[in-house]
């Protein structure tokens, strides 16, 4: 595998995006590009993102569309359409990664598999502290996170420990649950086979689960990324979930349609 494309979704939180990008800039593995996928932010976030385009140690591109509510799947499709890598890593702009994040995902990548990683949630109070002090969590030793866990500033600890696991990474090949696009690795060719995210999922909810279900229907299997590629997820208030029930109903209808693979309104509309 050569170039990896890291697609960072963001919306109106420049302070979080700064922390996310800074953690990507110190990666041990430099053979990747960053695509900032902006879901309609205002000028402040836009200027922050554009500023980093000139400061990044790796290739960094920025794509933005009009704010018409939560359309993360749409902006991710647009980002994939312009990316140059053969492997995709989806993360959110309110996530902080460790210095070996790219390297470990590269080690886990295997043809015919997608790789969901795990996340460690920060408390609301500690998130505020991290942002105000601009803490470089990616540079902290494991002892620091043990202390955070004891103080209940993070919700779990064991995700930070690397375990080889071996064949245990393959024991649930068709599991779609808890595979989220805040930390998900997919071969670009597999993403294109299923036509990416289905933009019929409007508003918050289940567009990532739908993607994974269609990957499984297409014969792409799950390789577990837990205990290898954790991310730190900053606390934020919940998104508007007014469309959640509609999206969930659509997801359940598709779950048992094993021949439903290709998104009805997907990435193909942005590719010549």
Ranges and model annotations:
Residues 22-31:
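Short, acidic, metal-binding catalytic loop of nucleotide-sugar glycosyltransferases
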């Amino acid at each position: 595998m050569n170039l990896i494309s890291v697609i960072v979704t963001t919306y109106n939180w420049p302070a979080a995006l700064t922390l996310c990008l800074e953690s990507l800039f110190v990666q041990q593995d430099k053979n990747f590009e960053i695509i900032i996928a902006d879901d309609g932010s205002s000028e402040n976030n836009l200027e922050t993102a554009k500023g980093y385009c000139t400061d990044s140690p790796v290739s960094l591109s920025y794509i933005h569309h009009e704010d018409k509510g939560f359309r993360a799947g749409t902006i991710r499709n647009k980002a994939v359409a312009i990316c140059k890598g053969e492997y995709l890593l989806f993360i959110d702009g309110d996530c902080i990664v460790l210095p070996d994040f790219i390297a470990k995902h590269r080690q886990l990548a295997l043809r015919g598999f997608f790789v969901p990683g795990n996340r460690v949630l920060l408390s609301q109070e500690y998130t505020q502290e991290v942002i105000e002090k601009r803490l470089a969590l990616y540079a902290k030793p494991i002892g620091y996170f043990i202390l955070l866990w004891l103080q209940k500033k993070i919700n779990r600890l064991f995700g930070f420990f690397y375990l080889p696991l071996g064949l245990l990474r393959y024991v649930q090949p068709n599991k779609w649950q808890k595979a989220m696009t805040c930390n998900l690795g997919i071969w670009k060719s597999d993403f294109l086979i299923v036509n990416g995210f289905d933009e019929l999922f409007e508003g918050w909810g289940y567009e990532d689960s739908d993607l994974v279900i269609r990957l499984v229907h297409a014969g792409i299997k799950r390789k577990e990324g837990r205990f290898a590629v954790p991310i730190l997820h900053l606390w934020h208030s919940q998104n508007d979930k007014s469309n959640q029930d509609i999206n969930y109903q659509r997801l359940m209808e598709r779950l048992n349609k094993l021949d439903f693979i290709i998104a009805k309104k997907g990435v193909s509309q942005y590719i010549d």
